[in-house]
Amino acid sequence: AKGGSQAITDAMVSHLRKLGGEVETGRWVGAIDELPAASSYVFDTSTSAMARIAGDRLPDVFRKKLNRLRHGPGIFKIDYALSDPVPWTNSDCRRAGTVHVGGSLDEIVRSEREMWEGIHSDEPFVLTSQPTVSDPSRAPEGKHVFWAYCHVPAGSELDRTEAIERQVERFAPGFRDCVLERNTMNCADYEAYNPNLIGGDIVGGVTDWRQLLT
């Protein structure tokens, strides 16, 4: 969507309001009784928050399962303002909206394994997005935006800027010369921004087969 995902959210909110709905933000909900009476509720929260808010309205067994959910790793993310597009050596990457930076398969496996072991990898697997490739309106004329993140052990507050930029530079020499501004967020920043992102976990829990089937 032109303008980014916020444009999609704005369109959905606009449609809801046309149908008579209301949207309220910036309000902490501690218990389900604080919400308007309804026949059903949809939660987009952590499982522990859902268990706390719904309280006795949930069966004890189910509530205990919600509170037992294992949270996954966190992330360290950098948002960039760039003077030029990312100078990827691979021409296909210059046209892609998303680029996963990992080097060899062995490197990727090692990076993710180390993260699960509580180690900050020297060569992290980095996920990047370059929105202005397809939507120039996301930045001032002639400029670009770019973001990149890597997985880190849950709750990590280590600054991973150098490791991430070193990885991008491997495949896009001169990248650092394009950086005008950067903003970083670690696990603590994410949880402060949204308490549902426990330990910086942005996917809502470990996605292994045991948890997916229980």
Spans of model-derived segments:
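A glycine-rich dinucleotide-binding beta-alpha-beta segment and adjacent secondary-structure elements
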Residues: 1, 122-127, 174-214
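Helical element adjacent to the flavin cofactor pocket in flavoenzyme catalytic cores
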Residues: 1-30
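Generic, well-ordered alpha-helical scaffold segments in large soluble proteins
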Residues: 11, 15-19, 44, 53, ...
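Surface-exposed helix-capping loop/turn segments at secondary-structure junctions
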Residues: 17-23, 88, 158, 169-181
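Mid-domain catalytic core of redox enzymes
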Residues: 21, 25-139
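Conserved FAD/dinucleotide-binding core of flavoprotein oxidoreductases
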Residues: 48-52, 81, 140-167
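Hydrophobic side chains in beta-strands
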Residues: 80-82, 101, 130, 150, ...
